[in-house]
C-alpha cells in the first residue's frame, strides 16, 4: 500500500505510580502499539509521558504539527478524569472545555 500520508496512533499518558496508578498507557504502547509498524508500515506510533499542563501543551503542539503535515492521528489519553476535568501527573486539573480546546485542532 503506497500512501502519501501515515496513520499515527499516539498515546499521551499522565499517570503517577506514587498515587498507585499502573502505567497502562506505557504497557499499551510497549506491548501492542510498538509492534504495529512492522506489520503495517503505513502506521506509526508515538508515546508522550506528560507530568504537567505545560508538558501537555508541548505534546499537543507536536501532534498538531503532525496533523498539519497531512498525517491522520488517533489520539489516546491515559489519565484520570472526573467532573472537573482531567487530573494530570502533578495533580493539576485541566477542565473538559480546556482539554476540548487544546485537542480540537488535532481533529479538524
Each language-model region and where it sits:
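A domain-level signal for caspase-like cysteine endopeptidase catalytic cores
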Residues: 1-80, 86-97, 108
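Structured alpha-helical
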Residues: 103
Amino acid at each position: 500500500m503506497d500512501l502519501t500520508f501515515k496513520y499515527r496512533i499516539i498515546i499521551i499518558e499522565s499517570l503517577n505510580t506514587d498515587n498507585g496508578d499502573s502505567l497502562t498507557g506505557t504497557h499499551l504502547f510497549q506491548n501492542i502499539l510498538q509492534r504495529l509498524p512492522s506489520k503495517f508500515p503505513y502506521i506509526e506510533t508515538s508515546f508522550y509521558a506528560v507530568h504537567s499542563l505545560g508538558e501537555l501543551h508541548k505534546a499537543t503542539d507536536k501532534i498538531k504539527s503532525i496533523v498539519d503535515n497531512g498525517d491522520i492521528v488517533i489520539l489516546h489519553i491515559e489519565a484520570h478524569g472526573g467532573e472537573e476535568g482531567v487530573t494530570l501527573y502533578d495533580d493539576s486539573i485541566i477542565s473538559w472545555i480546556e482539554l476540548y480546546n487544546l485537542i480540537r485542532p488535532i481533529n479538524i
